Amino acid sequence: MTVAVGDEIPVFTRTTGFANWNRYAAVNDEFVPIHMDDDAGRAAGMAGAFGMGNLQWAYLHNVVRDWLGDRGRIVRMECQFRAVNTKGQIVSAHGRVESVRERADDLLVELRVWTEDQDGNQLAPGTCTAVVNR
């Protein structure tokens, strides 16, 4: 696998809503009313129910894992939840290689990662460190 600074990794995209949120909640036992009920979301000051922040973090993991395949592994992932995702939004996860350090048996790759909505507004910017096998 060839990796260079500036490489953009293939985008991971999902349309958000109750179906995705319910599956995520079932796996993580996260049935929080603000994520499942529009009235609860409105009571919290939002337009309605909204997606879990950790689901966006999972989308970031997906985009990097899809890019790495069996050629490497994620060793660190961090992000900040700056905006919510709402029902019907198209959320895409992106990544760009920021640095590559050659080591004896592998490459240590630093990526800038982020989720954004269909209008290009960043929802969860972050960073990721991955090891890429030679």
Name each model feature, range by range.
Residues 40, 76, 104-105:
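Sparse recognition of residues in long alpha-helices and their boundaries
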Residues 76-82:
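Short structured motifs
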Residues 1-10, 85-134:
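HotDog/MaoC-like acyl-thioester-processing domains
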Residues 1-73:
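Hot-dog-fold acyl-thioester-processing enzymes
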